[in-house]
Amino acid sequence: MCGRFTLYSAFDDIIDQFDIDQFFPKGEYQPSYNVAPSQNILAIINDGSNNRLGKLRWGLIPPWAKDEKIGYKMINARAETITEKPAFRRPLVSKRCIIPADSFYEWKRLDSKTKIPMRIKLKSSALFAFAGLYEKWSTHQGYPLYTCTIITTEPNEFMKDIHDRMPVILAHDHEKEWLNPKNTSPDYLQSLLLPYDADDMEAYQVSSLVNSPKNNSAELLDAENHM
């Protein structure tokens, strides 16, 4: 699964890298070293003409859901079954997004009692994009709530040593394909959801402070040398 990530890159870098045409005021951007489910996260959609940057709550709530609690169980969608699950089939065709990040955290199991937090990033330290889906849900008061999920897939050779799942990091040339609303073939879209190139990734152990979403400072990026 993918349950924590970082996004602390400069706002202008995000705008430039993902060719964003419409976005909220720069002053509203807050870098985060410990993005967690149920938070409002940055996401990019394409409206047919422009790439738009906005905020979606992490944890997808299908339109037919009776209440928003289901969102806590839907922070991830499995790429292998995304065309089958009722909650994901519709947004796969019509409500796709990408979620910018500069690293993510995963907990590596050492034994039956011990797990250690690992920070995973690209060797280049470059920004990248998770593949995501979003939905619009109406509260009982009739207010719209926009939510999202991050898609996961089987681990590549690098990630296998850390976890049995990994988030889908889209290849750069696949980002536009994923966002393009003209692409509506479920099979084609599913074919874009591949494990990222293992040779381009690296990881290191970080402090257990990252275990709590309440902790959110640059020191979470520091390496722990206890492996």
UniProtKB/Swiss-Prot annotation:
GO function terms (MF aspect): lyase activity; peptidase activity; single-stranded DNA binding
What's the protein called, per UniProt?
A: Abasic site processing protein YoaM
User: What regulates this protein's activity?
Assistant: Formation and reversal of DNA-protein cross-link depends on DNA context. Catalyzes formation of the thiazolidine linkage in presence of abasic sites in single-stranded DNA. Mediates the reversal of the thiazolidine cross-link in presence of double stranded DNA.
Primary role: Sensor of abasic sites in single-stranded DNA (ssDNA) required to preserve genome integrity by promoting error-free repair of abasic sites. Recognizes and binds abasic sites in ssDNA at replication forks and chemically modifies the lesion by forming a covalent cross-link with DNA: forms a stable thiazolidine linkage between a ring-opened abasic site and the alpha-amino and sulfhydryl substituents of its N-terminal catalytic cysteine residue.
Question: Which residue numbers mark the site Required for sensing abasic sites?
Answer: 106
Family of this protein: Belongs to the SOS response-associated peptidase family.
Which residues act catalytically here?
Answer: 2 (nucleophile), 106
The site feature described as Required to stabilize abasic sites is recorded at 163
SUPFAM superfamilies reported for this sequence: BB1717-like (SSF143081)
Which PANTHER family does this entry report, sorted A to Z? Answer: ABASIC SITE PROCESSING PROTEIN HMCES, DC12-RELATED
Q: Name one Pfam family in it.
A: SRAP
Gene3D superfamilies recorded: SOS response associated peptidase-like (3.90.1680.10)
Keywords, comma-separated and alphabetical? Covalent protein-DNA linkage, DNA damage, DNA-binding, Hydrolase, Lyase, Protease, SOS response
Task: Give the UniProt record's GO annotations in the biological process aspect.
Answer: protein-DNA covalent cross-linking repair; proteolysis; SOS response
Q: Which residues carry this modification: Thiazolidine linkage to a ring-opened DNA abasic site?
A: 2
* EC assignment: 4.-.-.-, 3.4.-.-
Free-text note regarding domains: The N-terminal catalytic Cys-2 residue forms a thiazolidine linkage to a ring-opened DNA abasic site. Glu-106 catalyzes reversal of the thiazolidine linkage; self-reversal is favoured by duplex DNA formation. Glu-106 is also involved in sensing abasic sites in single-stranded DNA (ssDNA). His-163 stabilizes the abasic sites by forming a hydrogen bond with the O4' hydroxyl group.
InterPro entries given for it?
SRAP, SRAP-like
